[in-house]
A protein has these predicted regions:
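Conserved C-terminal structural/oligomerization subdomain of aldehyde/semialdehyde dehydrogenase
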Residues: 150, 256-360
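N-terminal Rossmann-like NAD(P)+-binding subdomain of aldehyde/semialdehyde dehydrogenases
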Residues: 1-31
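ALDH superfamily catalytic-core signature
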Residues: 90, 123-277, 300-301, 340
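Rossmann-like NAD(P) dinucleotide-binding subdomain of oxidoreductase/dehydrogenase enzymes
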Residues: 19-159, 297
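A generic structural signal for well-ordered alpha-helical segments
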Residues: 60, 132, 196, 232, ...
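Residue-level signal for inorganic ion chemistry
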Residues: 3, 64, 95, 116, ...
Length: 360
């Protein structure tokens, strides 16, 4: 765990480090000593409310800082429990939890912290950065974006479909590095659709009432996803829903959710969205749900153009065996962490740095 790793290595990390001194400065010596920044503010999101609150807090406190945490108001029970447990072990001037709505978060981001950590959407991250800049507070922003998933013509479709489904449907797609859209070679649409349906059925034999299949966080976000689908359909997209309880069968558009019982439980079935284009909101906004738009391509240059036309993503996924093609794509695109023939690894590998570029 992060806590165990930090405790094991903290003494070495904090140890003063001697550096070489130029001859003309002898007999002087020089060393680097690390010291705490002071008070670190943390604004954590709702999608992983423990990990993304306590992870930054562990790092900040290990470095000797005090922490003020503003957890998300969309997970009030988790936030209340965090405040209760933290209050049992820390004094308020060591580790404080501030609860409240978006207005409280806005005021929180304008406090004169020595450092401010924010995890959330790009739109809110911009507002946080502007507020922090008024105090000249340095920030660490972990945002998101539309992480592309590229399937090459030589990829193992069944393996790719299973790993893409896992990455897409973990927490019902409410993960900052979930595959946001798929780039698929023309001619492989039916084969991938069948493989994806089979993979989803293997992971989730049913959706409604299945405690292993996550719900969308609230009705507002559920309604937003519904609007994305309806707008895409109105603009010519074709939505294929994976029918609940039908195993590997790929449902037709006629079996779309009723938006009744599903909406009440907020368990939106997975769907592949075909025939999408860049003018659709579903291709402009980070989806944060179990919807996977698919773009068919003929040449890798089309893939490069599609990725570079948008904000730089937090993650990029490549499925294929041709190393030259893979390296060509990676040289010509800019993103955060890259995973080859799998998904979600940028956050799963504890010894790799995690972060994005630009808007991510």
């Amino acid at each position: 765990t992060m806590l165990t790793h930090t405790l094991r290595h903290l003494a070495r990390w904090m140890k003063p480090r001697r550096v070489w001194t130029p001859l003309h400065l002898l007999p002087a010596s020089a060393r680097i000593e690390r010291q705490p920044l002071g008070v670190v503010g943390i604004i954590s999101p709702w999608n992983y409310p423990l990990q993304l609150a306590l992870g930054p807090a562990i790092a900040a406190m290990a470095a000797g800082n005090r922490v003020m945490l503003k957890p998300s108001e969309l997970t009030p029970h988790t936030s209340a429990q965090l405040a209760h447990v933290i209050g049992q072990f820390f004094a308020p001037d060591e580790f404080a939890v501030v609860q409240g709505d978006a207005q409280v978060a806005s005021q929180f981001s304008g406090l004169p912290f020595d450092h401010l950590v924010f995890t959330g959407s790009t739109a809110v991250g911009r507002k946080v950065a502007i507020a922090a800049a008024q105090q000249l507070t340095p920030t660490t922003l972990e945002l998101g974006g539309k992480s592309p998933c590229i399937v090459a013509s030589d990829a193992d479709l069944e393996q790719a479909a299973l790993r893409i489904a896992h990455g897409k449907l973990l927490n019902a797609g409410q993960t900052c590095i979930a595959p946001d859209y798929l780039l698929l070679p023309k001619g492989q649409e039916q084969a991938f659709g069948d493989a994806y349906a089979k993979a989803v059925a293997q992971l989730f034999p049913s959706f409604m009432g299945n405690p292993d299949y996550a719900a969308i966080i609230n009705h507002k976000h559920y309604a937003r996803l519904r609007v994305l689908v309806q707008q895409a359909e109105a603009q010519g997209a074709y939505v294929q829903w994976l029918d609940d309880g039908q195993g590997a069968q790929l449902a037709s558009a006629a079996t779309a959710p009723s938006w009744g019982k599903e909406a009440a439980q907020r368990q939106m079935p997975p769907a592949l969205v075909w025939n999408v284009h860049s003018g659709m909101d579903i291709m402009r906004e980070e989806i944060f749900g179990p919807l996977l738009p698919v773009i068919s391509y003929e040449h890798l240059d089309d893939v490069i153009h599609a990725i570079n036309a948008g904000e730089r993503p937090l993650a990029l996924y490549w499925f294929g065996n041709d190393e030259k093609l893979r390296d060509s794509v990676l040289r010509r695109t800019v993103s955060g962490g890259v995973t080859v023939n799998d998904t979600l690894m940028p956050v799963a590998h504890a010894f790799l740095p995690f972060g994005g570029v630009g808007g991510s």
